[in-house]
Design a protein with these regions (language model features):
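Acidic (Asp/Glu)-rich catalytic clusters
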Residues: 41-47, 62-76, 93-106, 140-141, ...
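C-terminal domain-boundary segment and adjacent tail
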Residues: 177-180, 234-307
């Protein structure tokens, strides 16, 4: 069942009333960062189920995903605001000239691999704003009709001052912010073993209560390109490409679509929410002040170095 059909169908006899309605945004994160991710997205758009796509624009494969999405106006497109580059073998940097945002990049002009590394540098608020604005502008220039924005690895909202920048930009560009429309995250299938992801995804849908929900997935194909990448973060998954292929397969599984139909789950996207509820957006959390986040990041790095020294 496609999003367009779900949005246009009127409630029929036997279907859930509005108070019992289950609304679901299926958001696909990270397209644009590599060809394998884009091809996972392509498969889902053609064979599977999704409603929103969050594109990283500061990455090498932006043009491919921009062209792909032009053929799929039924999904909403978001700016996946990024301040990290987490892959050991595949680094990217800012859209802005790196010399103009030096507090958010490493010695080679690339983003840091983790939030902690970034925050330990005491990034300048004005440079964060400059870069996030540049990312939105580049996406628009490439023809991406942004309906919303969100944040890769949480870095762009990791401090209160950053969160306020994201909210300011959303207001200026008249776009939504994912999770600000009351959508609650479903149980994640991210770390579920690949051979169990489809069953788990179906189980998640079967157990959704009435209300508005957000399912975040990470498309990809198990190509050599993606298989060669290693996450620099300790929580990163081994065989990441196998996991992302499994998420793609789950969203293309007939059983996944069937439970949406059977339960009368209404697929919604941020085009709809932006049009109808932009004025109703509410902050779902409040980040800690930048000074506190920087202090904590530096303390954690110090403890990590001490631990490493103790092991030698």
């Amino acid at each position: 069942m496609g999003l367009e059909q779900s949005l246009s169908e009127e409630t029929k006899e036997g279907e859930p009333s509005q108070k019992d309605q289950i609304e679901l945004v299926i958001r696909l994160d990270d397209p644009g960062f590599c060809h394998s991710a884009n091809m996972g997205l392509k498969k889902i758009l053609e064979q599977g189920t999704c409603s929103s796509v969050s594109v990283i624009v500061a990455t090498p494969w932006l043009d491919e995903v921009a062209e792909l999405l032009r053929s799929h106006p039924e999904v909403s497109v978001g700016a996946h605001l990024v301040l990290n580059s987490e892959w050991k073998e595949f680094k990217w940097g800012p859209v802005s000239p790196y010399t103009e945002v030096s507090s958010i990049v490493d010695a080679f002009g690339k983003f840091f691999g983790s939030r902690r590394e970034l925050m330990a540098q005491a990034p300048k608020v004005e440079e964060v704003e400059k870069e996030l604005r540049a990312q939105i502008d580049l996406g628009l220039k490439k023809g991406l009709n942004f309906a919303y924005c969100d944040y890769h690895m949480g870095a762009a909202v990791n401090a209160l001052e950053f969160q306020e920048i994201v909210e300011k930009l959303a207001g200026e560009y008249r776009i939504g912010i994912s999770r600000y429309f009351g959508e609650k995250d479903t149980e994640s299938i991210y770390s579920v073993p690949p051979d169990k992801k489809t069953d788990k995804a179906i189980e998640v849908l079967e157990n959704l209560p009435p209300g508005r929900h957000l399912m975040v997935c990470h498309p990809g194909m198990n190509y050599p390109e993606m298989a060669a990448m290693t996450d620099l973060n300790s929580f990163g998954l081994k065989e990441m490409s196998v996991h992302r292929q499994a998420e793609t397969d789950a969203l293309c599984d007939p059983g996944f679509r069937e439970v949406i139909r059977k339960r009368g789950i209404k697929l919604i996207n941020y085009n709809h929410l932006r049009k109808e509820e932009l004025h109703l957006m509410t902050r779902p959390f409040t980040a800690k002040p930048l000074e506190e986040v920087v202090r904590q990041a530096r303390m954690e790095k110090k403890l990590e170095r001490a631990d490493e020294a103790g092991k030698k």
